[in-house]
């Protein structure tokens, strides 16, 4: 498809020095690989953008794609490093970590992060639904054990 061809052309042009490997071009390349559903190449491109151009949003996108691809451990490594970031970026990392912990049925860790997110207005509703879900899950586990 078009995204795949676009990504191949852009990647080749950047490799040959015909186009600058600028942050904008690197981001476009990552987006094209995503559009082509070439997940490993998309992850690599976002990772490169995050490292070379110090872009936290790119690092966040890497974590999202890793989670989407079922690579929970790799995503968690990325997110743990980002969760202490101030503001919305840190909260987004915590939210993704909640999801990762839920994927692994690590309810205590998920609950702790969800409760932290409840303190922030724009995350309160989602975090509360996570807390309710986690409590329902752990109640079910406790009843089965009894």
Residue spans for each PLM region:
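Extracytoplasmic and endomembrane cell-envelope/extracellular-matrix remodeling and assembly machinery
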Residues: 1-28, 40-41, 47
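Generic helix N-cap/helix-start motif at coil->alpha-helix transitions
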Residues: 2, 20-27, 52-61, 88-95, ...
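Solenoid-like repeat scaffolds
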Residues: 11-20, 46-55, 80-88, 115-123
């Amino acid at each position: 498809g078009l995204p795949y061809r676009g990504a191949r052309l852009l990647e080749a042009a950047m490799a040959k020095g015909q186009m600058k490997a600028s942050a904008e071009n690197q981001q476009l390349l990552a987006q094209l690989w995503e559009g082509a559903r070439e997940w490993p190449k998309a992850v690599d491109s976002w990772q490169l953008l995050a490292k070379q151009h110090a872009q936290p949003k790119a690092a966040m996108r890497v974590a999202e794609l890793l989670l989407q691809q079922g690579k929970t451990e790799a995503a968690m490594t990325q997110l743990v490093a980002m969760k202490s970031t101030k503001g919305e970026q840190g909260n987004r990392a915590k939210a993704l970590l909640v999801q990762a912990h839920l994927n692994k049925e690590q309810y205590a860790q998920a609950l702790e992060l969800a409760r932290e997110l409840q303190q922030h207005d724009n995350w309160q509703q989602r975090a509360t639904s996570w807390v309710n879900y986690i409590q329902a899950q752990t109640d079910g586990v406790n009843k089965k054990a009894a």
